[in-house]
């Protein structure tokens, strides 16, 4: 056969696996349906600004080895994710911390904040376990935070009332009794100075990459080219949606250049009221501390997904999980195909988790 491995998808998972296989002397053909590599971490250089084409991506990890691995290919900056929430024109720091509590209630000490949190939690006390997301959130943080910073944003994100969403979506909500706006607790955090596309291109260096190529459109011909297949696309599509499609949410972006040096003063601002149609605005230059006299922003809208559109977030409710398990049972009967990545495994994964799992998968492939 012409190649040792056929890798379907050039996102973070596929590219990381390719790098490990290539370093072990294996030949790889990578097929990408989109006109560019990188999947959803793809960044496009526009007028000197790296635009996160599919939404904000901030790499974070507690594992030094993974941080060093990424540094083999790109230079990571020291960007720290400190998003802001805009509720009806009022600004609040995220995650929920002493700055947030001061902005909400005027409290200045952890003791005052804890007392108010406990008071509001007690008001929301239930005689039964939380049955939906609203009850869960009220139990965790009380009504003020729920109404201003969770409810509207979450309902826009998922397209349904919080009372109809499962409580498992927010198993926990971090509450910090310190003045700390760092969203992630990870020891290492940053964004590639050269953009994420540069990272993907370095990971894929040495592989044959074919963009604008739909593996599923001519599967038999592509399978004949390699000894083994690594598939990172939608698992239901692989099996021709034989049990019906899995459900996702999609995201739509409106991106524009503005002739001003600074639009919102922060990379990410969430709009948490129900009246604002978009969920957040991203100002891309702030990810890499840009100083250009202009800026580029993206408004992010969450919407229902239909087959043929780009899937973003899996809807991991009970119905879809049962459906996924049926597809997984079919995948288990394909020993020559490795299914990995967020779409093939129907779950959300942070970038560090995706890369670590890709590294483990590559190691297993090389040992098999």
Place the predicted regions along the sequence by residue.
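Glycine-rich FAD pyrophosphate-binding loop
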Residues: 22-47
């Amino acid at each position: 056969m012409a190649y040792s491995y056929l890798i379907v998808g050039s996102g973070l998972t596929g590219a990381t696996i390719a790098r490990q296989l290539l370093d072990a002397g294996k030949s790889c053909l990578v097929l990408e349906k989109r006109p560019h590599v990188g999947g959803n971490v793809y960044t496009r250089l526009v007028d000197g600004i790296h635009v996160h084409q599919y939404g904000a991506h901030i790499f974070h990890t507690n594992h030094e080895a993974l941080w060093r691995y990424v540094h083999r290919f790109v230079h990571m900056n020291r960007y720290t994710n400190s998003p802001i929430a805009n509720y009806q024109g009022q600004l609040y720091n995220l995650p929920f911390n002493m700055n947030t509590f001061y902005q909400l209630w005027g409290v200045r000490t952890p003791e005052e904040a804890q007392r108010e949190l406990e008071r509001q939690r007690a008001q929301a006390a239930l005689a039964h376990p939380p049955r939906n997301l609203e009850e869960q959130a009220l139990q965790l943080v009380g009504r003020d935070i729920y109404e201003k910073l969770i409810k509207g944003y979450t309902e826009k994100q998922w397209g349904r009332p919080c009372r109809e969403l499962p409580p498992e979506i927010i198993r926990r909500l971090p509450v910090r009794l310190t003045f700390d706006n760092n969203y992630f607790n990870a020891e290492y955090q940053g964004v590639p100075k050269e953009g994420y596309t540069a990272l993907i291109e370095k990971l894929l260096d040495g592989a044959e990459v074919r963009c604008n190529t739909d593996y599923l459109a001519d599967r038999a011909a592509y399978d004949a080219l390699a000894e083994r297949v690594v598939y990172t696309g939608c698992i239901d599509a692989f099996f021709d949606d034989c049990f019906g499609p899995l459900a996702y949410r999609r995201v739509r972006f409106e991106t524009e250049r503005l002739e001003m040096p600074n639009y919102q003063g922060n990379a990410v601002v969430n709009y948490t009221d129900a009246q604002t149609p978009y969920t957040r605005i991203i100002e891309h230059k702030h990810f890499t501390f840009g100083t250009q006299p202009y800026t580029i922003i993206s408004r992010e809208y969450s919407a229902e997904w239909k087959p043929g559109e780009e899937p973003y977030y899996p809807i991991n409710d009970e119905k879809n999980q049962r459906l996924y398990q049926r597809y997984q049972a079919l995948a288990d009967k394909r020993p020559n195909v490795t299914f990995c990545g967020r779409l093939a495994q129907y779950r959300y994964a942070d970038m560090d988790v995706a890369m670590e799992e890709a590294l483990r998968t590559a190691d297993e492939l090389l040992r098999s």
